């Protein structure tokens, strides 16, 4: 296991709720604040971190306020017809073309940037550190929520789906790799705990083509709440600070 330095920044995903961490990271950029040794992002959190490491304040706010709301991105009709609810291919193509990403800034930063993904064939979490050339595809994989996005994203011959399925907030992994001072940017208020899924049978049926994902999808709440317990009661010698949205945040 690759060891990292002591100071880690972890950014939770959460679709549109990622606008909260986006705002914090934009402020960090304005203040030139980046005292971290490693970066960990899942789903929308990975996308926000990419803009932060590319030093592009305001970039992802445009995605939340404009591109994410366009009919090209979310299409229930397409999903009913057997396609994807979210067109991640369109999202990455159009935003890379119109907003760009500073590849040279990303390449110049030697600090590891881990993207949390879930293997489609066994439901296990993996933490990938892609090259700049593979970053967009890996971010797409980290955001490919099963059911909403039907077939996962293939990276080096392996299919992956949203990292939030197996490990939504990779605090334990960061600790295992040597992080002792951890900041977590959350997408949910501090009081939030994930509930058991309401439609277990429906989820199982919709995932019949990917049986290895059924159990991880139905037990997400258990792992998520265990991570919250770890954040609130870290092991001796580990300091964890979480920054959460206000209680009314939806």
Name the predicted role of every residue range:
Residues 1-40, 50-250:
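Patatin-like phospholipase
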């Amino acid at each position: 296991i690759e060891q990292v330095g002591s100071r880690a920044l972890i950014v939770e995903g959460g679709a549109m709720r990622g606008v909260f961490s986006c705002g914090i990271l934009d402020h960090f950029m304005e203040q030139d604040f980046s005292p971290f040794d490693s970066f960990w992002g899942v789903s929308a959190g990975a996308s926000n971190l990419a803009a932060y490491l590319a030093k592009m304040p305001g970039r992802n706010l445009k995605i939340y306020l404009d591109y994410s709301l366009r009919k090209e991105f979310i299409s229930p009709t397409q999903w009913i017809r057997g396609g994807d609810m979210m067109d991640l291919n369109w999202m990455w193509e159009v935003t890379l073309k119109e907003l760009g990403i500073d590849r040279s800034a990303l390449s110049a930063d030697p600090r590891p940037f881990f993207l949390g993904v879930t293997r489609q064939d066994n439901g296990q979490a993996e933490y990938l550190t892609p090259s700049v050339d593979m970053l967009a595809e890996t971010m797409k994989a980290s955001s490919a929520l099963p059911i909403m996005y039907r077939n996962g994203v293939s990276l080096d011959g392996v299919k992956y789906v949203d990292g939030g399925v197996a490990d939504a907030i990779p605090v334990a992994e960061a600790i295992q790799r040597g992080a002792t001072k951890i900041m977590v940017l959350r997408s949910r208020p501090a009081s939030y705990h994930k509930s058991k899924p309401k439609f277990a049978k429906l989820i199982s049926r919709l995932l019949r083509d990917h049986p290895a994902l059924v159990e991880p999808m139905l037990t997400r709440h258990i792992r998520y709440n265990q991570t919250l317990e770890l954040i609130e009661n870290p092991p001796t010698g580990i300091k964890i600070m979480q920054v959460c949205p206000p209680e009314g945040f939806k």
